Curated annotation (Swiss-Prot):
The keyword Magnesium is annotated on this UniProt entry: yes
Function description: RuBisCO catalyzes two reactions: the carboxylation of D-ribulose 1,5-bisphosphate, the primary event in carbon dioxide fixation, as well as the oxidative fragmentation of the pentose substrate in the photorespiration process. Both reactions occur simultaneously and in competition at the same active site.
Organism lineage: Eukaryota, Viridiplantae, Streptophyta, Embryophyta, Tracheophyta
Name of this protein: Ribulose bisphosphate carboxylase large chain
Site positions per UniProt: Transition state stabilizer: K300
Pfam families in UniProt: RuBisCO_large, RuBisCO_large_N
């Protein structure tokens, strides 16, 4: 069975058992009345069952309801159908005040019907020939308004300075100021020029997201013909069907696939209603993607540390034990489905480097947009500053130093032999994003 954990807040007067049963029925075989065609099938075989209810500590009106869904309710290899069944209709149910899907347990039999990520973590490292450290990226800013040639120039400067990747912003598709084909050509030129100068393999996440699947595939095919290593997709706005289609193409044609989660906070930010990002992360691993944005813990975007580390493990590891202290409701066995690299992006800069290196480890992408392009000396020095800071943190960690305790000291030591890093440290020494997370663990 597929197991689901729902956070249920019933309407006043509705007992939790009735609310849990309603969720199970409405998201499987049930309807609002008895119908004569019920007698033509075996409802006992197909209906969802609410098998356990537990109160939420500190909130007498909320319950965690566990529902089991028989596997025959779902089409094989279709994240689209899985979500249509489990969350498609039930969230508008009048007997519930609010409802949130906290986690899913995907059984091995269903997991094996998915291709998963096009390549996975180890294959990506082998393609890029980069080992022993996090990868580094940069979102090109301003996100909208640059011409294709100026955009390509910014890409070149960042890659030349020492970054591994640069990135289209999620809303860069094919607008009047910069059509997709022009952007692809200038970015490819920038990649090849930077590779020739540095001797390192470089990439730019070329956003293939489009208004139709056919147009999306046309862009991905053009990227492959240019010989670039990676393309990008906005998987929530583009949809799971489009994403799985693109992931299959990427595996067949040797392209890495970077996934942006634009629109996720509409679904996952409120603690009481919607769907937790760990569910969206699991679905992405099944649908397919080699990278996905996963918050930063320390930057400008929402993300509590324990929760973030919980779904980072769900993205990367083969087997994850149930651990409610990190928000993981079920043990999950991925049976060798390739892992996804989490991307830390959003309001981060060189002073965050020790914390990011400690939190995310080597199998991650640390992405500095403003933290690269905002450098007072320009894009390339901004890239140099980030690369030097990362190398210093990795070296210190490998020597056994405590990044959490000595992080600032490590960065200041590196400043002595990198004027670019010293300038960056001066610019961002006062920048902090200290707000309490909306989505927190139950205490």
């Amino acid at each position: 069975d597929i197991l689901a954990a729902f956070r249920v807040t019933p309407q006043p007067g509705v007992p939790p058992e009735e609310a849990g049963a309603a969720v199970a029925a409405e998201s499987s075989t049930g309807t609002w009345t008895t119908v004569w065609t019920d007698g033509l099938t075996s409802l006992d075989r197909y209906k969802g069952r609410c098998y356990h209810i537990e109160p939420v500590p500190g909130d007498p009106d909320q319950y965690i309801c566990y529902v089991a869904y028989p596997l025959d309710l779902f089409e094989e290899g279709s994240x689209t159908n899985m979500f249509t069944s489990i969350v498609g209709n039930v969230f508008g149910f009048k007997a519930l005040r609010v409802l949130r899907l906290e986690d899913l347990r995907i059984p091995v039999a269903y997991t094996k019907t998915f291709q998963g990520p096009p390549h996975g973590i180890q294959v990506e490292r082998d393609k890029l020939n980069k080992y022993g450290r996090p990868l580094m990226g940069c979102t090109i800013k301003p996100k909208l308004g640059l011409s294709a040639k100026n955009y390509g120039r910014a890409v070149y400067e960042c890659l030349r300075g020492g970054l591994d990747f640069t990135k289209d912003d999620e809303n860069v598709n094919s607008q009047p100021f910069m059509r997709w084909r022009d952007r692809f050509l200038f970015c490819a030129e920038a990649i090849y020029k930077a590779q020739a100068e540095t001797g390192e393999i470089k990439g730019h996440y070329l956003n293939a997201t489009a208004g139709t699947c056919e147009e999306m595939m046309k862009r991905a095919i053009f990227a492959r013909e240019l010989g670039v290593p990676i393309v990008m997709h906005d998987y929530l706005t583009g949809g799971f069907t489009a994403n799985t289609t693109l992931a299959h193409y990427c595996r067949d044609n040797g392209l890495l696939l970077h996934i942006h989660r634009a629109m996720h906070a509409v679904i996952d930010r409120q603690k009481n209603h919607g769907m937790h990002f760990r569910v969206l992360a699991k679905a992405l691993r099944m649908s397919g993607g080699d990278h996905i944005h996963a918050g930063t813990v320390v930057g400008k975007l929402e993300g509590e540390r324990d929760i973030t580390l919980g779904f980072v493990d769900l993205l990367r590891d083969d087997y994850i034990e149930k651990d409610r202290s990190r928000g993981i409701y079920f043990t999950q066995d991925w049976v060798s489905l390739p892992g996804v690299i989490p991307v830390a992006s959003g309001g981060i800069h060189v002073w965050h480097m020790p914390a990011l290196t400690e939190i995310f480890g080597d199998d991650s992408v640390l992405q500095f947009g403003g933290g690269t392009l905002g450098h007072p000396w320009g894009n390339a020095p901004g890239a140099v500053a980030n690369r030097v800071a990362l190398e210093a943190c990795v070296k210190a960690r490998n020597e056994g130093r405590d990044l959490a305790a000595e992080g600032n000291v490590i960065i200041r030591e590196a400043c002595k032999w990198s004027p670019e890093l010293s300038a960056a440290c001066e610019v961002w020494k006062e920048i902090k994003f200290e707000f309490e997370a909306m989505d927190t663990l139950d205490k």
